[in-house]
Structures are given as structure tokens and as C-alpha cells.
Regions:
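Metal-dependent phosphoesterase signature
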Residues: 13-29, 55-64, 78-79, 96-105
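Acidic, Mg2+-coordinating phosphoryl-transfer loop and its flanking beta/alpha structural elements
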Residues: 130-169
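Substrate-recognition element of Asp-dependent hydrolases with the DxDx(T/V) motif
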Residues: 32, 36-69, 82-95, 141
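Conserved Lys-Pro-Asp/Glu-containing loop-to-beta segment of HAD-superfamily phosphomonoesterases
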Residues: 105-138
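Short acidic-hydrophobic, aromatic-tinged amphipathic segments that line or gate anion-handling sites
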Residues: 171-176, 180
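Active-site neighborhood of HAD-like aspartate-dependent phosphohydrolases
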Residues: 1-47
Length: 189
């Protein structure tokens, strides 16, 4: 079994923008590659899990998202593969595109993306983490039995209080993805 770090995309690996629609607008945090490398060196699979309701809302297409992810992988995997998988949910019940306007177990805080990655990458959830910037990310981690690290980038500073109010027991609060990776790296094996 493998251990993994499930990582939210927007606000965690890259700058949060209102519905990232175009690959040209992708701005990866300057420390993201170092952070991902630290986790790889520690023996973790890096798995991105991201809600992309902009597809259901008609703001962009799955083809647009594919181009964004290709650019992300081109940046992060330039020297060595640092991202082992990308899982996304294009669904939202308030969408305008009928095929995506549904309830889905893939949409966080449900754990469908985590379970799919577990199956495809033979992941032991008990030895795995989730790093994200929202209450929804931390709720997903809680629902999946993962260790929870909230980063204060993106919406993290905003959602910290909600996590506390909703009794989400955070394992660590990190300034950013690099701080979170260093925290994991410093834990005993």
C-alpha cells in the first residue's frame, strides 16, 4: 500500500482566481515544486483533488480544464514527475449544463475522488494526508479519515474559523503548501 497526500488545486498549488478558465491564467505558487518534491522524497504520492463546478456552470469546458492540467503538469513534472494523479468533479446541482447538473459522490466534501484515487494508486488512507485551503477540503479529509492540514493561502484564512466552529480537528495549520510539506517531512516515519 502507498501513502499519499491529497492536495486541493486552487488556492493551494496555484493562485486562487475566480473560476480558472484558461491555461494562460494558471499561476503556480513559486514554492509549489519544492513542496511537491519534499513530499515525493518522503515517499508520498501527490494526488490533486479539485471541484470544478465552473464546468457545470458553463464557464469553461472539460477540454479547457484538460489544457489547464496539462500546463500544470508541464510546470510541476518538468524535471521529475511530482504529481501522480489529478481527479476533478465537474458537477454542481446549480449548474446550467444538464449533464453536469447532478449530485455526485465525486464532489467534495464527498469522498468519491479520494476513493477513486485509493483504488487506482493502492493508497492506505490511514497513513495519508489532505492539504487544502477550504472548509470543504477539511470536511472531505475528515469524511475520508485523512490527516487534515489547512493552508492559509487561497481561502484558508477565511475558512479557518469555520473549521473551528464546525469542530473540524485540524492536524496542522500551515502558512502555505511548503510549510505543510515541511511539517509532514518532519514527522517521524
Amino acid at each position: 500500500m502507498n501513502k499519499a497526500v491529497f492536495i486541493d488545486r486552487d488556492g493551494t498549488i496555484n493562485e486562487e482566481v475566480d473560476y480558472l478558465k484558461h491555461a494562460d491564467d494558471l499561476s503556480v505558487f513559486p514554492y509549489a515544486i519544492e513542496a511537491l518534491q519534499i513530499l515525493k522524497n518522503k515517499g508520498f504520492k501527490n494526488i490533486i483533488v479539485t471541484n470544478q463546478s465552473g464546468i457545470a456552470r458553463g464557464f469553461f469546458t472539460e477540454e479547457d480544464l484538460k489544457l489547464i492540467h496539462e500546463k500544470l503538469l508541464g510546470i510541476t513534472n518538468k524535471i521529475t514527475p511530482l504529481i501522480d494523479g489529478i481527479y476533478y468533479s465537474p458537477y454542481h446541482t446549480e449548474g446550467t449544463i444538464e449533464e453536469y447538473k447532478i449530485e455526485s459522490d465525486l464532489r467534495k466534501p464527498r469522498i468519491g475522488m479520494v476513493l477513486k484515487a485509493r483504488e487506482e494508486h493502492s493508497i492506505d488512507l490511514n497513513s495519508s494526508f489532505f492539504i487544502g485551503d477550504t472548509y470543504t477540503d477539511m470536511k472531505t479529509a475528515q469524511n475520508a479519515g485523512l490527516k487534515k492540514i489547512l493552508v492559509l493561502t487561497g481561502y484558508g484564512a477565511r475558512d479557518l474559523q469555520k473549521c473551528l466552529d464546525e469542530n473540524i480537528q485540524l492536524d496542522f495549520i500551515a502558512a502555505d503548501l511548503l510549510d505543510a510539506s515541511n511539517h509532514i517531512n518532519n514527522l517521524p516515519n
